[in-house]
Regions:
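ABC ATP-binding cassette signature C-motif
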Residues: 1-184
Length: 184
C-alpha cells in the first residue's frame, strides 16, 4: 500500500502553495493518473512520493508518506545528466538486481519491449537513445529492480506509437501499483 496523508507542498522561494491537504491511498493492483497543467507541481509531487529529499532544497513539505514494504520505482521526465553519459551496459550493470537475473529472465524482459537481451550489453550512450528507447530502458531497469510501485512522470512525452503501445501494455498488465502523471 502507498498512502499519502495531508500533504502540503509550498515553494520556499515565493511561498506559492503547490498542493494543500492532499490525500491518496493506492493498494496492490490500483492504477491512478494525476492530470494537470504544465508547471503546476506534478513532477514535484512525483519526486516527493519517490523520495522527499529530492525536493528538499526548494520545497517545504508537510505530511505523511507511508510506503510499507513497497519498492518504489521512478521514471522521470528526463534522463539525468549522469545517466546520459553512461553506456547502456553501465546503466543496467550498476543495478545489483541485474546480476541476480538469469539470461532467460533478461531475455523475457527485453522481449516485452520488442528487443533482444543484447541491448543490455550495448556500449551506446544512454543520452544518444531516442525518447522511446530511453523510456523502454528505464522501464526495463525498474522491472529488473522488482519494484512494486511504478511512478511514471509523463512517460508518454516524446515517444513513438510502438513505445506508447508497449507502455500501455506494461501498465495494464502490471499487478502492483501504478501512479501516472500527465499534462492537460
Amino acid at each position: 500500500m502507498l498512502q499519502i496523508k495531508n500533504l502540503n507542498l509550498t515553494h520556499k522561494k515565493d511561498l506559492r502553495v503547490i498542493l494543500s491537504e492532499f490525500n491518496l491511498v493506492l493498494n496492490k493492483g490500483d492504477k491512478a493518473v494525476i492530470i494537470g497543467e504544465e508547471g503546476n507541481g506534478k513532477s514535484t509531487l512525483m519526486k516527493w512520493i519517490y523520495n522527499p529529499l529530492l525536493i528538499d532544497n526548494y520545497i517545504e513539505a508537510e505530511g505523511e508518506r507511508l510506503v510499507g514494504k513497497e519498492i518504489l520505482g521512478y521514471l522521470p521526465q528526463e534522463i539525468s545528466e549522469e545517466d546520459k553519459e553512461k553506456t547502456i551496459y553501465e546503466f543496467f550493470s550498476a543495478e545489483e538486481m541485474f546480476w541476480n537475473r538469469t539470461p532467460k529472465e533478461l531475455s523475457e524482459i527485453t522481449g516485452k519491449f520488442g528487443m533482444t537481451s543484447e541491448f543490455f550489453y550495448s556500449d551506446q550512450k544512454m543520452g544518444s537513445l531516442s525518447g522511446g528507447e530511453k523510456v523502454k530502458a528505464h522501464l526495463m531497469r525498474l522491472i529488473i529492480q522488482d519494484v512494486t510501485v511504478l511512478l511514471l512522470d509523463e512517460p508518454s512525452n516524446d515517444i513513438d506509437i510502438n513505445t506508447l503501445e508497449i507502455l500501455e501494455k506494461i501498465i495494464n498488465d502490471w499487478e502492483h501499483i501504478v501512479l501516472f502523471m500527465m499534462k492537460l
